[in-house]
Amino acid sequence: MDSSTLSPAVTATDAPIPSYERIRNAADISVIVIYFVVVMAVGLWAMFSTNRGTVGGFFLAGRSMVWWPIGASLFASNIGSGHFVGLAGTGAAAGIAMGGFEWNALVLVVVLGWIFVPIYIKAGVVTMPEYLRKRFGGKRIQIYLSVLSLLLYIFTKISADIFSGAIFINLALGLDIYLAIFILLAITALYTITGGLAAVIYTDTLQTAIMLVGSFILTGFAFNEVGGYEAFMDKYMKAIPTKVSNGNFTAKEECYTPRADSFHIFRDPITGDMPWPGLIFGLAILALWYWCTDQVIVQRCLSAKNMSHVKADCTLCGYLKLLPMFLMVMPGMISRILYTEKIACVLPEECQKYCGTPVGCTNIAYPTLVVELMPNGLRGLMLSVMMASLMSSLTSIFNSASTLFTMDIYTKIRKKASEKELMIAGRLFILVLIGISIAWVPIVQSAQSGQLFDYIQSITSYLGPPIAAVFLLAIFCKRVNEQGAFWGLILGFLIGISRMITEFAYGTGSCMEPSNCPKIICGVHYLYFAIILFVISVITILIISFLTKPIPDVHLYRWCWSLRNSKEERIDLDAGEEEDIPEDSKDTIEIDTEAPQKKKGCFRRAYDLFCGLDQDKGPKMTKEEEEAMKMKMTDTSEKPLWRTVVNINGIILLAVAVFCHAYFA
């Protein structure tokens, strides 16, 4: 682009005050207010219309959800503000390769719906660590995975979403970051605590619609501004900043020029920033961990009313995952074209002036596009989109983390906890998570913004592969036992954490200032490292399992793929142990409800209604009804017609995935 085209954009964004003032108009503010009112209304509707007074109701929505809100919720839970900021930023810096991360999910959601979820449902579990406890016996794997998952939620998912949201809010509104985050977390926690999983899924559905509408509008404006797709491809390769030297210092050319392979997903296996073997195989391992074993994702599928709905919601999510390439990655690249000096800055002092960080400003590509390009009203809609993505991800994490804590950790501390106590504990833990999240903000704020998205992916590469290996072998290899699974997890964790600590001790570096980390440790791309770690974990699990005593088939009926259709009676490995919710505590609840009760005051009745703790409402289930409910929670049957329909759609989705990868290869 010529300098005359660039200069107005640069001038407009030199000072932050005009950006703040742009959003302060009646149209934008009205849209934002309406958005919050509608979201709270949906949350309150879910609060009054769903059963939140039981563990199954609060954490699994009573297995009564239909496919389309679950599919939307899966997408919204995955697409956080980190995607809008991180994907667009990576697109601005390096082209479309990161879109391959999104398209990889098209295959894994089919694996989730057709292979993993049927096993989870037959196991009758609420959490993923609980499945491993029932599959292997013992409690150490369950507790280990629960604690590790909670740490991953806090230090990767929550921190990334909060940081990304803060970037946008600070640029668009000029609010103090802590005030903005506190308000968002407060509203998010409010309808998560009060509504349970049903409220989260319904609000996610609303926010998915908002995200898609707003993103399509912005993408249309962006492509119109740049002159269409052909012009976009041509101008991106010429989007080079003019200020590349300062005195005697001149930046290296590769640090500020677009990559020659910017419009290719598959890149050189040695020199590529996203090597194609890592993208195919390494990313598949990370995606297996995220899509098939992560509590946030699987919990939504477990809430579906039957298996056909599970498969349909996975298929819908897969089709939605086609969109981020066009709605996030490419708009980020267009932002570099329109605001080259700002987004593609290379000199530390220039980047510091534009976005407050010396390592680069690609992370503000999407927010800048929104603030500079959108008209009044639509700008407010896009701010709502960013808040929607932030809040939907946080609600998913809060609900799933509270499930992990309540079902896998709290029940070990309080073995005879009543249903009501479990409900309160789950809600209080959400408040604890919020406190930790706010305390973590300064650390996230001080992180190198240019490295945030890679930071998230690398953490997953270091900690996720052993978990993926254990779940994969637990389902497909019945010979694997508890000793093999546990020590495979421990060895994999030690190797991964060693690489992570070493890398971050030396610093991840940047194009301008490469890291001094030894090549033998940090020279291996994190996607290649994920493959190596996965293979080591699998070998360790298999060797130890084959050297120790196997688990008899009588304990594995319907919990392994080879025994999934067995009709024989199963003896659970944990049958002799106390269940998460012991019978005597259930009896206590029943006795309490039958005894004469004092009339509750207005405040107490309102409190019980607000938190879903009014268990007296409605008749108690008989033993026969309880058995019927248990059968429903573990039923994987399908009607032949709908099984055929969803299977055909699954095949079409896989074909679309192959086409997309081939077209942009």
From Swiss-Prot:
Disulfide bonds join 255-511, 255-611, 345-351, 355-361, 517-522. The record marks 460 as: Involved in sugar-binding/transport and inhibitor binding. The modification Phosphoserine is found at residue 585. Coiled coil: none annotated. Expressed in enterocytes and enteroendocrine cells of small intestine (at protein level). Expressed in S3 segments of renal proximal tubules (at protein level). Expressed in endometrial glandular and epithelial cells (at protein level). Disruption phenotype: Mutant mice had significantly lower embryo implantation rate associated with lower litter size. On a standard diet, they developed symptoms of the glucose and galactose malabsorption and died within 2 days after weaning, a phenotype reminiscent of GGM syndrome in humans. Weaned mice survived and were fertile when maintained on a glucose and galactose free diet. One of its GO terms (molecular function) is water transmembrane transporter activity. N-glycosylation is not necessary for the cotransporter function. The record marks 43, 300 as: Implicated in sodium coupling. The modification Phosphothreonine is found at residue 588. Keywords: Cell membrane, Disulfide bond, Glycoprotein, Ion transport, Membrane, Phosphoprotein, Sodium, Sodium transport, Sugar transport, Symport, Transmembrane, Transmembrane helix, Transport. NCBIfam families: sss. This is Sodium/glucose cotransporter 1. The gene is Slc5a1.
